[in-house]
Amino acid sequence: IFFNFGYDINTNIDFLLNFIIVLSLILFLNLCGLIYMGDSGAYLLSLFTGIYLINFSYNNEYISPFLIIVLLWYPCFELLFSMIRRYKDKTKTYKPDSSHLHQFIYNFIKKEFNFNNNVIHFSTSTIINSYNLLVFIIAINFIYSSKMLILIIVLNIFVYISAYIFFKKKYQMDN
């Protein structure tokens, strides 16, 4: 029973362990080039992660719900930012584009360093994930303080938009 959300702590631990195992396997296969998840796979994993985190927040009333927002801020804001950008630019949402922060960082690494594509992809992922890991480590110190967690969210949005503007000016490639 993979998605049995009860109030029993063992059920939540079982789910978390199963989720970590599946996520680790998918990550390993993806890094080895044996599987490509694409946007649909990323959205599916995000859905399951979101369900678990919302349930976790609901069952732990002493932890600020803004902690969950901090944990999910990057993919949620990336999607929201892309939707607003595409609406403003009048581009179709179902067509791929290369105007995402991760693609600008990729172009930066490609232009500034002489790495092969696998190293560039790995470096781009490492930069974004390391930043988010640092944010998570800081946020965990304030799990009971909604005010601090809101400040962290606002600062992250500011950093994201600033980085986006900087990298877009310098490293946007033609679509």
Write out the residue ranges for each language-model feature.
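Alpha-helical transmembrane segments
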Residues: 1-175
